[in-house]
Amino acid sequence: MGKPTGFMESGRTPPERRATTERIYDYNEYYHRWSDTEAQEQGSRCMDCAVPFCHMGCPLGNVIPEFNHHVYKGEWEKALKVLLSTNNFPEFTGRICPAPCEASCVLSINSDPVTIEYIEKEISDRGFEQGWIKPEPPTTRTGKKVAVVGSGPSGLAAAQQLNRAGHKVTVLERADYIGGLLMLGIPDFKLDKTVVKRRVALMEKEGIEFKTGVNVGVNFSVTELLGNYDAICLTGGSTEARDLPVPGRDLDGVHFAMEYLPQQNRRLQGVDPNANDAITAEGKRVVILGGGDTGADCLGTAHRQGAEIVHQYELLPEPPVERPENNPWPQWPSILRTSGAHEEGGLRDYNILTKSFSGTDGKLEKLHGVRVEWTPADT
């Protein structure tokens, strides 16, 4: 524990976000960087609890109190070593993880939690800047060949671990970019794609082979897969959308998020869609159905494309600002969350059930819905 009184002396201060009036005109990431003093102050707030519940919240089991201690001491390389012992890609999780560790932080019982996610991002960014994160090719090879099907975060992590164990690893990706939803789903304003490309380039230097446009079972048979590799690791992503089977669903103008977001990400990589297939919010009145993170990603993208107005509708009731009694710490808090996209504008509404869409000549004009009331079930 670096500073026993740190949590009493310093408050939670995340990195400052860029002004909304500036950032809605570009796709650059939201946040400014901390100074050394600011970062160390945030690290000092960690209490190094006897039972660190942040470990329970973190799916990776990150050794959070230890890297917070090193950050407070200004020992950034040591902090990085601790972080990399459990997390293959802290530069990803430090940007887009929902941070369940913070929800489980003991400080959050009656105060604001430690800024764990932002500390993680700062450690990894400094690691790359200082040259501490570098290729780690295996010293010996086993002679075994492994195929990893899918190049999202789980596929990349599996490939890195298998390669470091000495196996010859080939990652097969059906899309045109390595990275899965990191490249084609998450908007650039949350995860700059140079961050993903930097990691992929480093993994190539470690000896991992990447192949795009390989769709197993479509243009690459299972027989070929089984015949060419000693082992196969399936890490396919979750790109199958949940549809809304209501009248008018097939009208032109009703789209899945995974039809909309990847197009914009490809545009930023210099690949424009076919004019007949292009989806843009420019000058349009937009409705987003779904109040979660994906909906917020669509909201931020619509702002940047120049939408006239954006409404985001959620079927469930508006969450409370603070934890209700039936949602105690250290459970994940079911509370109202305001993302950077919500700060930028748009209107949110709750208890909205979509009944149908209507339009003229096959083009969407109206959404028809009702307001619902949620009541406890009879017991």
Protein language model features and the residues they cover:
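Residues forming the flavin
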Residues: 1-37, 42, 120-379
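Generic structural signal for well-ordered, non-membrane alpha-helical segments
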Residues: 32, 36, 60, 64, ...
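Immediate flanking context of iron-sulfur cluster ligation sites
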Residues: 32-53, 76-100
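Functionally engaged cysteine thiol sites
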Residues: 46-49, 97, 105, 276, ...
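Iron-sulfur cluster-binding cysteine motifs and their immediate structural context
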Residues: 48-73, 94-123, 170, 174-177, ...
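Short microdomains enriched in Cys/His and/or Lys/Arg
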Residues: 69-89, 117-136, 141
